[in-house]
């Protein structure tokens, strides 16, 4: 068995502690929210916020995150078993569940498309403004300003 350096062990333990602390905080928040919200989603938002605010550096969580991503299929096994155990309930409400999935997908696609068009439209307008500025500046250099 390969001997792990003390630094690697410390790094792994620190990363596990960071993830555990974030999940503990997200579980506490989830139990106190008036609406049902998965603690894992809250944890992702907290982790993302801490990374954006540079409270936590990417290097402090990157290797454990990569390792967990590598075994993500295994981590979904309990969720799959829960879905299989709930097939009776899902069969009872199949039409409602299917309707929600279809409507949510259509809304998501529409909002994503509109947002992309909005962003691309702004980008094209900025590109046109820059081209117009270059033409005006070029005219000024040659003394052709209207």
Curated annotation (Swiss-Prot):
Q: Per the annotation, which location comes first and is thus the protein's main one?
A: membrane
Where is it found, in Gene Ontology cellular component terms?
Answer: plasma membrane
Q: Taxonomically, which superkingdom?
A: Bacteria
Q: Does the keyword Transmembrane helix apply?
A: yes
**Keyword Transcription regulation in record:** no
Topology relative to the membrane, per the entry? Multi-pass membrane protein
Q: Where are the transmembrane segments?
A: 9-31, 35-57, 64-83, 93-115
Where is the protein situated, by its record's location annotation?
Answer: Cell membrane
Any one GO BP annotation for this protein: programmed cell death
| Pfam families registered for this protein in UniProt | LrgA
- UniProt KW keywords: Cell membrane, Cytolysis, Membrane, Transmembrane, Transmembrane helix
Q: Which family does it belong to?
A: Belongs to the CidA/LrgA family. LrgA subfamily.
NCBIfam families found in the cross-reference section: PRK04125.1 (NF003155)
**So what does this one do?**
Inhibits the expression or activity of extracellular murein hydrolases by interacting, possibly with LrgB, with the holin-like protein CidA. The LrgAB and CidA proteins may affect the proton motive force of the membrane. May be involved in programmed cell death (PCD), possibly triggering PCD in response to antibiotics and environmental stresses.
HAMAP family for the chain:
LrgA
Q: Which PANTHER family match?
A: ANTIHOLIN-LIKE PROTEIN LRGA, HOLIN-LIKE PROTEIN CIDA-RELATED
Q: What is this protein called?
A: Antiholin-like protein LrgA
């Amino acid at each position: 068995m390969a001997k792990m350096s003390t630094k690697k062990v410390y790094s792994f333990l620190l990363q596990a502690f960071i993830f555990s602390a974030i999940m503990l905080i997200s579980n506490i928040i989830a139990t106190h929210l008036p609406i049902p919200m998965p603690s894992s989603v809250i944890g992702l938002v907290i982790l993302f916020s801490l990374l954006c605010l540079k409270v936590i550096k990417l290097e402090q969580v990157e290797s454990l995150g990569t390792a967990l991503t590598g075994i993500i299929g295994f981590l979904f096994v309990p969720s799959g078993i829960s879905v299989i155990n709930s097939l009776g309930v899902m069969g009872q409400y199949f039409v409602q569940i299917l309707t929600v999935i279809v409507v949510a997908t259509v809304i998501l696609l529409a909002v994503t498309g509109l947002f992309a068009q909005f962003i691309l439209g702004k980008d094209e307008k900025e590109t046109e403004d820059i081209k117009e500025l270059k033409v005006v500046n070029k005219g000024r250099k040659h003394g052709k300003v209207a």
